[in-house]
């Protein structure tokens, strides 16, 4: 038996291992995972309960990995055994890696969902409300697709007042993600302008999971989440549930269903308006009847108040007349009282006057007798001043006197008085 050097035995082992284990599938738990930022290579160990083997995933293969490799994952690696002669080490050079029991796409999608959930992409608080009566809707789809034709037909039937604008985009295959992302951004760029869209609908009909899978892409999710315009995802059929359905403000099972959800039914609203009109008419009649009854009540009250007001005014006038009458009565009574007092005074003093009158009559008779017995010279006369006899010696210039005898009476004014 030949004696081999360390290098020789390691080289033979390398050749044997690489030839024998050219392609292998090995399952185990990922541990000691290290991803070099510069090179992009990933180094880790694959272990089970009894053993460990080192693995390497070079950058080219790592970029094709559909999910994020994490510590503790149960995976199945596909690759070949390679040996490093200087150290006598061997490892699995991984070409592909899949999660154990589930596909890599499924795991990748679950990982992405968790990432977006933590960022709040699915929170209801971040969802925009559906517009009640859309006037302008952007539909991101293929302009030659059956989905677009169905959507136009349903929209024209349900709500013909709405303007449906097709933004043509690739809806499957290579370039689909970028085309949809750009279309969403374009439609949303009108936000806040007079040509703004009330809603953006991303729509395509059914297809294979491979055809629909682009709508699980993170870039489309980002575009929908960042849009300021209300968005809807209408991809595939009822059974197809994609990431875009979770991120959009509202999900529709099909493109046709999107139009049924988004647009109100003109027929239903016409029926509602008829119902509103009937209710309004009934309410108006009831209100009119109530107001009429109230008006009649007010009119009756007004008449009653008018009569009462007139009665009150008449009562005031009567009261004033009563007061005036009382005042006049009192004034008349006071006048009569005064007059009565005067009459009473005169009545009380009438015997005195009668006595004086009788005396005066006696004096007058005596005077007449005196005149009759008095012998006056011919053409003589009595002289009096102020109805009183006065001697000539007492007269003075300017006195007014009266001259009288049995036959006549005369008035005179003294011009001068000469003493004898």
Curated annotation (Swiss-Prot):
Assembly with partners or alone: Heterooligomer composed of large and small subunits.
Reported function: Bidirectionally degrades single-stranded DNA into large acid-insoluble oligonucleotides, which are then degraded further into small acid-soluble oligonucleotides.
Keywords linked to the UniProt accession: Cytoplasm, Exonuclease, Hydrolase, Nuclease
Protein name: Exodeoxyribonuclease 7 large subunit
Catalytic activity: Exonucleolytic cleavage in either 5'- to 3'- or 3'- to 5'-direction to yield nucleoside 5'-phosphates
Entry-linked Pfam families: Exonuc_VII_L, tRNA_anti_2
Keyword flag Nuclease: yes
GO MF term list: exodeoxyribonuclease VII activity; nucleic acid binding
CDD domains referenced in this protein's UniProt entry, alphabetically: ExoVII_LU_OBF (cd04489)
Record-listed E.C. numbers: 3.1.11.6
NCBIfam families: xseA
Lineage of origin: Bacteria, Pseudomonadati, Campylobacterota, Epsilonproteobacteria, Campylobacterales
Example GO biological process: DNA catabolic process
Organism: Helicobacter pylori (strain Shi470)
GO CC list: cytoplasm; exodeoxyribonuclease VII complex
Main location: cytoplasm
């Amino acid at each position: 038996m030949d004696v081999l050097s360390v290098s020789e035995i390691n080289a033979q082992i390398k050749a044997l291992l690489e030839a024998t284990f050219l392609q292998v599938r090995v399952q185990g738990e990922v541990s000691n995972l290290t991803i070099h930022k510069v090179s992009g290579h990933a180094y880790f160990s694959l272990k089970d309960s009894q053993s460990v083997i080192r693995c390497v995933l070079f950058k080219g293969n790592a970029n094709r990995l559909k999910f994020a490799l994490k510590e503790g994952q149960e995976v199945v690696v596909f690759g070949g055994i390679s040996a490093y002669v200087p150290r006598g080490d061997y490892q699995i050079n991984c070409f592909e890696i899949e999660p154990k029991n589930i596909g890599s796409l499924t795991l990748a999608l679950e990982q992405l969902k968790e990432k977006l959930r933590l960022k709040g992409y699915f929170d209801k608080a971040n969802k925009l409300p559906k517009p009640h009566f859309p006037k302008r809707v952007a539909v991101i789809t293929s302009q030659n697709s059956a989905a677009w034709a169905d959507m136009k037909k349903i929209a024209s039937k349900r709500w013909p007042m709405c303007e449906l604008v097709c933004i043509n985009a690739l809806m499957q295959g290579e370039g689909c993600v970028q085309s949809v992302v750009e279309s969403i951004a374009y439609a949303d760029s009108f936000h806040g302008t007079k040509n703004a869209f009330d809603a953006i609908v991303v729509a395509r009909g059914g297809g294979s999971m491979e055809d629909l899978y682009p709508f699980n892409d993170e870039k489309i999710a980002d575009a929908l989440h960042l849009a300021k315009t209300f968005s809807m995802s209408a991809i595939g059929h009822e059974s197809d549930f994609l990431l875009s359905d979770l991120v959009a403000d509202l999900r529709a099972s099909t493109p046709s269903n999107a139009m049924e959800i988004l647009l109100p039914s003109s027929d239903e609203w016409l029926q509602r308006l008829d119902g509103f009109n009937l209710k309004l008419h009934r309410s108006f009649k009831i209100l009119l009847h109530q107001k009429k009854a109230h008006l009649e009540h007010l009119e009756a009250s007004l008449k009653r108040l008018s009569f009462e007001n007139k009665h009150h005014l008449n009562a005031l006038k009567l009261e004033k007349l009563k007061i005036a009458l009382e005042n006049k009565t009192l004034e008349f009574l006071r006048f009569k009282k005064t007059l009565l007092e005067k009459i009473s005074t005169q009545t009380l003093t009438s015997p005195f006057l009668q006595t004086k009158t009788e005396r005066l009559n006696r004096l007058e008779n005596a005077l007449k007798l005196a005149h009759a017995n008095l012998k006056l010279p011919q053409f003589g006369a009595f002289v009096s001043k102020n109805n009183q006899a006065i001697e000539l010696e007492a007269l003075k210039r300017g006195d007014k006197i009266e001259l009288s005898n049995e036959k006549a009476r005369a008035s005179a004014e003294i011009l001068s008085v000469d003493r004898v």
